[in-house]
């Protein structure tokens, strides 16, 4: 007999109005969806309440330093060994993994795309992932990939976990219901969510539009954490209390289901007779979370000059080299521009880091035209980039009174590794062939005579 029961903390049926979250970043949480399901005083009782099984999910080696040691104890209806059977090969040909050196004819250059097309076929979130760039090597847990996603169907009886890295999901069009082993998150545009490496989940659509679209950073390296604030001090940027981790929720469903796995760049599928989202209680610090980008508290120049964009870092995945990120997640949120005698947009730049950008909402101040919500750009290491001719002339001649840059939200996945373009991205019909022309209007002003020109 098919029976589906979705219960959240407190035994309530999980609806949007009853979803609850626990605040904090990296906390050691505890939560149960049935009273008494969580053991007290120990992790692995001889027998667990409700007939549950105890299982540990480790996100770091056992001997990692305490500050970076991550694990959670899960109390579930069946142990995970019952959530996989014999695997078969599966294929998601547009989801690529580093190292990926696709053959295509597009030469090196600065690149920009309009939004990827809406699908004509029925696609789930898993089927709708399209890789734009890859960097590093997933097998050695180094680097990242930048993906776009577009879908129109729910993952009803399909579940997925990614052994290659954690997934930072950035919705641009359409809200998501993200049902993970450890709870449920509703995530809308201008919010993000993170699903840890190895964690089972499925994604459902919420709302009535025709298509759901967004971006994903697949981080192969050390997990995302909050960047150090340095002399900024103890406050501002992304504050820990604004990160929300879901309370326990489980799906009690006895029906044929499929579990999909990504492992070292290959995909596999196995069939089971029940939902694997069966964690009734858990405690620990290896957990998913969501974050509202509108709660980011930006800092900036309050007298002159334009600071480095690192001041807008929300999350960073570090490497062994201090201050050098495997990947940074950076946003460009609404903010006041008040600098005197200053060119206020981002300056022209060549960078050892490689920058993938997307636009969630509004306009980006360095390029008011051509870079549209749902679009993407790629400026690889040491390739020059900066404001287009229109933005330069406007900012260079503007009256420098305080101006609020509002109704905008751009972001960047920035990595120390070169981002290799996939064949899909190189041949995408929305690639802007005329992107480089946006700088054509930047004429020579120098004539050898002193003075402002």
From Swiss-Prot:
GO biological process, one term: L-phenylalanine catabolic process
Residues annotated to bind Fe cation: 349, 355, 385
Binding-site residues for homogentisate, renumbered to this chain: 364, 385
Cofactor(s) required for function per UniProt: Fe cation
Species annotation: Rhizobium leguminosarum bv. trifolii (strain WSM2304)
CDD domains referenced in this protein's UniProt entry, alphabetically: cupin_HGO_N
InterPro entries: HgmA_C (IPR046451), HgmA_N (IPR046452), Homogentis_dOase (IPR005708), Homogentis_dOase_bac (IPR022950), RmlC-like_jellyroll (IPR014710), RmlC_Cupin_sf (IPR011051)
Gene Ontology molecular function: homogentisate 1,2-dioxygenase activity; iron ion binding
EC code(s) of this entry: 1.13.11.5
Protein name: Homogentisate 1,2-dioxygenase
Quaternary organization: Hexamer; dimer of trimers.
Catalytic-site annotation from UniProt: 306
Pathways involved: Amino-acid degradation; L-phenylalanine degradation; acetoacetate and fumarate from L-phenylalanine: step 4/6
Family designation: Belongs to the homogentisate dioxygenase family.
Catalysed reactions, semicolon-separated: homogentisate + O2 = 4-maleylacetoacetate + H(+)
Gene3D superfamilies found in the cross-reference section: Jelly Rolls
Role, per record: Involved in the catabolism of homogentisate (2,5-dihydroxyphenylacetate or 2,5-OH-PhAc), a central intermediate in the degradation of phenylalanine and tyrosine. Catalyzes the oxidative ring cleavage of the aromatic ring of homogentisate to yield maleylacetoacetate.
Keywords on record: Dioxygenase, Iron, Metal-binding, Oxidoreductase, Phenylalanine catabolism, Tyrosine catabolism
Entry GO terms, CC: cytoplasm
